[in-house]
Design a protein with these regions (language model features):
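Conserved Radical SAM active-site core
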Residues: 1-118
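Auxiliary Fe-S-binding modules of radical SAM enzymes
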Residues: 14, 35, 113-114, 121-216
Length: 216
């Protein structure tokens, strides 16, 4: 954790107006484990060093069977939810995500949305909790799942339906973000007419989804 504390303090000193939106729940859990800390202690120290908000990375699909199939090394459903709840109790704003289109079934997508909604409902009054929800399509290029015969099957209409369902179910989360980086600008623009109210940010550099086949 010392590395991140020093990094965050240096960034805040050099760029006082910058807001640090960094480290998802898996990273927080990993830092806590290798530092001999609880995740709550880890979050407190990172916030003291300058962390402003936590991205929703690593949520994938919040279902134990799905996670065992696609990301067995990542924290469990319970761990992801626990880190986010701790962040909320400390007043740290977060976002939530859903990566769909691999081995999950429609009911597991719905269960994922309900888990996010229920966690937001537990956010202490006056704390920001989840500020946004961002669903995106699984990109298969170069992944282990592709080698097992599971490839990207992107449908713009399905994405629009997921955006609409997210807006209806997540009535306690203020913003639904269209992931233009993974679905393309045209689909993201259509999503703005279907429940999304956020297009996210312009990225200076991105290597994760581009390496998996996204070319937006």
């Amino acid at each position: 954790i010392d590395f991140y504390e020093e990094l965050f303090r240096d960034l805040k000193r050099m760029f006082p107006r910058i807001r640090l939106h960094a480290l998802g729940a898996p990273e927080v859990a990993h830092i806590a484990r290798i530092s001999g800390l609880t995740t709550l202690e880890t979050l407190r120290r990172l916030m003291a060093a300058g962390l402003d908000s936590l991205p929703g990375a690593g949520a994938e699909i919040l279902d134990p069977d799905v996670r065992r199939a696609i990301s067995p090394a990542k924290p469990s459903v319970a761990s992801w939810l626990a880190v986010m709840h701790e962040a909320h109790t400390l007043g740290l704003a977060t976002s939530a995500t859903m990566m769909y289109g691999h081995v999950e079934q429609p009911r597991q997508r719905v269960d994922h949305l309900l888990a996010i909604r229920d966690l937001q409902a537990r956010c202490p009054e006056g704390k920001p909790g989840f500020l946004a929800f961002i669903p995106w399509i699984f990109r298969s290029t170069g992944t282990r799942l592709e080698a097992e015969g599971i490839s990207t099957d992107f449908s713009p209409l399905e994405y629009i339906r997921i955006i609409a369902a997210s807006r209806l179910i997540l009535n306690n989360i203020p913003n639904i973000q269209a992931s233009w980086l993974t679905v393309g600008r045209q689909t993201a623009q259509a999503a703005l007419h279907s429940g999304a109210n956020d297009m996210g940010s312009i990225m200076i550099e991105e290597h994760v989804v581009s390496s998996a086949g996204a070319d937006n």
